[in-house]
């Protein structure tokens, strides 16, 4: 059993992009920004607990931070982890919270 407090910290935010929106419409997949040290089992358990849905599978990607220029100096954005969570048929997560 995974620590409940840890599960609440695993999922940081939904990741919104063209690719994520297309994946949600076509493949019933939701994309999240997650902790870098989170594993697939933790991500699955966290999504099932937080959003009360059934998860079919989880795929993860380590995203490298981009190098950005600020005038003559260079800076770097942080590396982060992205999780593609495939929901079972008939399951849905509504981030907009629409009523009615």
UniProtKB/Swiss-Prot annotation:
Annotated GO molecular function terms are: rRNA binding; structural constituent of ribosome
Q: Which InterPro entries match?
A: Nucleotide-bd_a/b_plait_sf, Ribosomal_uL23-like, Ribosomal_uL23/eL15/eS24_sf
Which Gene3D superfamilies does this entry report, sorted A to Z? Answer: 3.30.70.330
Q: Which UniProt keywords apply?
A: Ribonucleoprotein, Ribosomal protein, RNA-binding, rRNA-binding
Q: Name one GO biological process term.
A: translation
The record's comment on protein family reads: Belongs to the universal ribosomal protein uL23 family.
> What binding partners and quaternary form does the record give?
Part of the 50S ribosomal subunit. Contacts protein L29, and trigger factor when it is bound to the ribosome.
UniProt protein name: Large ribosomal subunit protein uL23
The lineage is: Bacteria, Pseudomonadati, Pseudomonadota, Gammaproteobacteria, Alteromonadales
């Amino acid at each position: 059993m995974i620590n409940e407090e840890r599960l609440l910290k695993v999922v940081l935010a939904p990741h919104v992009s063209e690719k994520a929106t297309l994946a949600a419409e076509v493949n019933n997949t939701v994309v999240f920004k997650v902790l870098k040290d989170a594993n697939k089992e933790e991500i699955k358990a966290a999504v099932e607990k937080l959003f009360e849905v059934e998860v079919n599978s989880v795929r993860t990607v380590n995203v490298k931070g981009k190098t950005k220029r600020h005038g003559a100096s260079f800076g770097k954005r942080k590396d982060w982890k992205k999780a593609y969570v495939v929901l079972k048929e008939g399951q849905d997560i509504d981030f907009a919270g629409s009523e009615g």
